[in-house]
């Protein structure tokens, strides 16, 4: 929600998720969620207190921090678009080192579950397109590594 609010301040009116959903609906492509909104909200509710939320909102309201956050989000987006995997790997590694309990809940455990959901999804033998945040594809605890553990061969295009 906070990211969306910041992007709106930068005149971005549609999130990438919204764009993918709209394009899929226009083309009649069936959508399946790897995580429900309720799951994500429950996860955040279990990780953050109301004081954490207020502190984050206060930080975002601070114009300097807001600009830093927007720059970080743009840098992340540009790294993804330009294939700068090193930037993304460093960011993921920093999170794992600096806040391991959050990393485990927000990255590792979710990636294990999403890989399981992908494995179940592809059992029908049909082609599927999977969309998740780019950092879920990065690092030693990534969805890709989890799929490799399940016997899949991963090729970067």
Segment roles from a protein language model:
Residues 1-102, 106:
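Structured, acidic catalytic/metal-binding patches in enzyme active sites
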Residues 101-157:
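A cross-kingdom marker for long, charged
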């Amino acid at each position: 929600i906070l990211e969306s609010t910041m992007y709106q301040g930068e005149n971005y009116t549609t999130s990438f998720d919204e764009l993918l959903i709209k394009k899929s609906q226009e083309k009649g492509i069936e959508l399946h969620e790897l995580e429900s909104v309720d799951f994500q909200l429950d996860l955040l509710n279990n990780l953050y207190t109301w004081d954490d939320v207020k502190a984050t909102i206060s930080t975002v309201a601070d114009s300097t921090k807001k600009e830093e956050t927007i720059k970080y989000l743009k840098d992340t987006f540009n790294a993804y678009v330009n294939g700068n995997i090193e930037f993304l790997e460093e960011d993921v590694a920093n999170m794992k080192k600096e806040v391991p309990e959050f990393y485990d809940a927000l990255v590792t455990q979710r990636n294990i579950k999403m890989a399981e959901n992908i494995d179940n999804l592809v059992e029908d033998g049909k082609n599927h397109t999977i969309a998740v945040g780019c950092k879920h594809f990065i690092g030693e605890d990534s969805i890709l590594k989890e799929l490799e553990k399940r016997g899949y061969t991963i090729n970067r295009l």
